[in-house]
């Protein structure tokens, strides 16, 4: 429960200040920073930044929803459910908040509750890409084949949007549908080849499928785009170790004929 400490307002309220570039650090500033953190896969930072948004405007429903989504991405499904309940006390008809709670419930094992909240999100005129991605998430948790339609619906609502495609890939990856996740990530890379996170997760899918060479290339691209990406460095180290072991094992088999 440690992430609940100061989660809503991030600590004491502070006066508006200015960043080094002279931009006012207000609600809009922190919301943009939170979105950037989300896009970079920095979910802990995103969680804190959405809290900063609420310091300036506790009625920002998107920031509340953002907090729930960050908790989901961090694998904190129970906390996400509890925080969604708190947010829904303020915004009981917010479609994306209902959808986020549905995902938290589904991943936490409450499949019936997940479907009910997903239904509610759609009934609240929630015709947004995230509502449909959340629906797909719930249906995959329930092992229902209709999930494919929901993915297609989400992508149709945001044509050419790499971010939505990436989110879809993350859902596929969570449910170990690595081939389908790979296809989505390839589309996302075509749209935004300069984003390190896409290359990193592309490499993770390739690695899961045993595609060592392509995975190494993807991790290398991620590292070049973001030299501070420790996940890419660790993955490359792991692949190098795997390659060395294969060479040693091959030599051993050739020497001893086993």
Regions found by a protein language model. Name each.
Residues 23-56, 62, 66-73, 103, ...:
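Alpha-helical segment of the N-proximal tetratricopeptide repeat
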Residues 8-29:
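TPR-adjacent "capping" and linker segments in tetratricopeptide-repeat scaffold/adaptor proteins
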Residues 137-141, 204-207, 230-246:
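TPR/TPR-like alpha-solenoid helical repeat scaffolds
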Residues 27, 61-62, 95-96, 127-130, ...:
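Helix-start (N-cap) detector for alpha-helical repeat units in TPR-like alpha-solenoids
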Residues 103, 130-141, 152-190:
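Alpha-helical adaptor scaffolds
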Residues 8-11, 40-48, 74-86, 108-120, ...:
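Structural signature of tandem alpha-helical TPR/SEL1-like repeats
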């Amino acid at each position: 429960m440690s992430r609940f400490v100061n989660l809503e307002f991030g600590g004491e309220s502070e006066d508006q200040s200015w960043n080094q570039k002279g931009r006012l650090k207000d609600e809009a500033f922190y919301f943009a920073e939170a979105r950037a953190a989300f896009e970079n896969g920095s979910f802990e930072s995103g969680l804190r930044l959405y809290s900063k948004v609420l310091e300036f405007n506790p009625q920002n429903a998107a920031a509340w929803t953002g907090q729930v989504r960050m908790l989901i991405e961090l694998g904190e499904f129970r906390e996400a459910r509890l925080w969604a309940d708190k947010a829904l006390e303020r915004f009981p008809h917010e479609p994306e908040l209902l959808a986020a709670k549905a995902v938290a419930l589904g991943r936490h094992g409450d499949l019936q509750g997940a479907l009910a909240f997903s239904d509610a999100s759609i009934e609240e005129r929630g015709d947004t890409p995230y509502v449909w991605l959340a629906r797909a998430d719930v249906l995959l948790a329930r092992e229902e084949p209709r999930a494919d339609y929901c993915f297609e619906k989400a992508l149709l609502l945001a044509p050419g949007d790499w971010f939505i495609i990436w989110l879809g890939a993350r859902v596929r990856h969570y449910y170990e549908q690595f081939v389908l996740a790979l296809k989505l990530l390839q589309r996302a890379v075509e749209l935004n080849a300069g984003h390190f996170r896409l290359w990193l997760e592309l490499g993770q899918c390739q690695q899961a499928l045993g595609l060592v060479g392509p995975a190494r290339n993807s991790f290398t691209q991620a590292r070049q785009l973001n030299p501070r990406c420790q996940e890419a460095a660790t993955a490359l180290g792991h692949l190098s170790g795997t390659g060395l072991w294969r060479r040693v094992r091959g030599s051993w088999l050739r020497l001893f004929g086993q």
